[in-house]
């Protein structure tokens, strides 16, 4: 009887891992259908009690695997750009920019996961699928991300995604007007404007 129980437990664990693997494969396959796109987005941030913290909007350009431009226009302008090697963050209001190597940037943030879409990243999560919804829970609890949810259609269109941090703060993003196709490569380059203070972490 004990042997049967152990066998059943092993089979159950295998079945769960297969479901997670299938969900990860389906998610990657869907995102792979669109190699580059532009979309506008709205953002809503709530705290652990559900109270609104911030609302915003902006535009997003992606060319996988490592080119992206995340341009927040409201409430305050900020820009996050990857040229494939360097990750730039620019805040026009305070006239400051920072530069880090993309390879050193954390890959466990929702946006980096979507932009990279690499199997090695998805393997770090337990993934459950319900139709077009994918719920990701980190296998390691060491990071700040508690849960990540993304809704992506079979044709690769991302409708929305949200992230819950360990303190239960939730950031939700609704994408709209996604346009698939070639993106102007100038969107993925950044030259600090004159007078901007640059914190270059690449040589430290």
Curated annotation (Swiss-Prot):
Source species of the chain: Cronobacter sakazakii (strain ATCC BAA-894)
Function: Participates in the translocation of lipoproteins from the inner membrane to the outer membrane. Only forms a complex with a lipoprotein if the residue after the N-terminal Cys is not an aspartate (The Asp acts as a targeting signal to indicate that the lipoprotein should stay in the inner membrane).
Gene Ontology annotations for the cellular component aspect, listed alphabetically: outer membrane-bounded periplasmic space
Signal peptide: 1-21
GO annotation, biological process: lipoprotein localization to outer membrane; lipoprotein transport
The keyword Nucleus is assigned to this record: no
Protein name per UniProt: Outer-membrane lipoprotein carrier protein
Family membership noted in the UniProt record: Belongs to the LolA family.
Top-rank lineage group of the source organism: Bacteria
Compositionally biased residues, Polar residues: 171-181
Primary localization: periplasm
InterPro entries on file: LolA/LolB/LppX, OM_lipoprot_carrier_LolA-like, OM_lipoprot_carrier_LolA_Pbac
Keywords, comma-separated and alphabetical: Chaperone, Periplasm, Protein transport, Signal, Transport
Subcellular location: Periplasm
Subunit: Monomer.
Pfam family, one: LolA
Region entry Disordered, spans: 169-204
């Amino acid at each position: 009887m004990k042997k049967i129980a152990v066998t059943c437990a092993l089979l159950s664990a295998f079945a769960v891992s297969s479901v997670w693997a299938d969900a990860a494969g389906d998610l990657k396959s869907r995102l792979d259908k669109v190699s580059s796109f532009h979309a506008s987005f709205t953002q809503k941030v709530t705290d652990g009690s559900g109270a609104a913290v911030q609302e915003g909007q902006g535009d997003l350009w992606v060319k996988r695997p490592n080119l992206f431009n995340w341009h927040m226009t409201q409430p305050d302008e900020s820009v996050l750009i990857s040229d494939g090697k360097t990750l730039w963050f620019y805040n026009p209001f305070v006239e400051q920019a920072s530069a880090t190597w993309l390879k050193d940037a954390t890959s466990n943030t929702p946006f980096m996961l979507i932009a990279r879409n690499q199997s090695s990243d998805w393997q770090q999560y337990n993934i459950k699928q319900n139709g077009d919804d994918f719920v990701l829970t980190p296998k390691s609890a060491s990071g700040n991300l508690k849960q990540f949810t993304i809704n992506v259609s079979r044709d690769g269109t991302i409708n929305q995604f949200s992230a819950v941090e360990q303190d239960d703060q939730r950031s939700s993003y609704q994408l709209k007007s996604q346009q698939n196709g070639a993106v102007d490569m100038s969107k993925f380059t950044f030259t600090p404007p004159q007078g901007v203070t640059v914190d270059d972490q690449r040589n430290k």
